[in-house]
Amino acid sequence: MPTIGFHAQHEQAHPRDLRDSAVHAEQAGFDAVMCSDHLAPWSRRQGHSGLTFAWLGAALQATERVPMGCFHAPGQRYHPVISAQAFATLAAMFPGRFPWVALGSGEALNEHVTGDPWPTKDVRMARLRECVDVMRALWRGEEVSHRGLVTVDRARVWSLPDEPPKLVAGAVSAETAAWAAEWADGLITVNQPPDLLRRVAGAYRDAGGRGELHLQVHLSWARDDDAALAAACETWRSNCLPTSLAWELETPEQFEAATRHVPPEE
């Protein structure tokens, strides 16, 4: 049986309201909750972007049973030692209820704030791979030093869970899915035409990928189709951009400019 979860979209709601939505999702019978991890929304109309670490602690405390996971991009805005410590703390405080983190190479929208250069995709993927090794070593209780695309000097995470979260790969393309198969504990991707989804999942499995497959499905709910379409156009035009462009834009204003003329049917 598939697990049907609720996506807590930080970019669209005040953190307090989003916490309450997670409670309502559990009460309504959803099997899980996941959330985004952005510093900025994709548009000013969306209007919010709470801190995932803080929100997850509050949401896990406010609910009773549903497991939760999140997207995350270590390596620039987040140092992997801080990522490892934060997720270890959540997993230790809520045993069995923080089972996975979905890792990606990030977007300039969130990462440019450090002032560091925004790397090319291949460098970001290599940096992510280093972060995976650093985080897992810390969760094994090791003291870690590392010199590469990220630097770590004698770090240790002292409060560890009995079971650390799985590191799931976020991938949109078949190429990235195949690359992630070597290290990932599972795969998460987003809704695309069925033939593309089969290619992504097949590439992951063919490359030896293990674990569960997760699919994030975007939908717009309203009392009639016209209202649902209007709501989607108002807040989610950014979904129409190719990922190769979306990764590079740095501000909500740039996303708005790039999608200003997207027609509703797209």
State where each predicted segment sits.
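Active-site-adjacent structural elements that line small-molecule/cofactor binding pockets in enzymes
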Residues: M1-E266
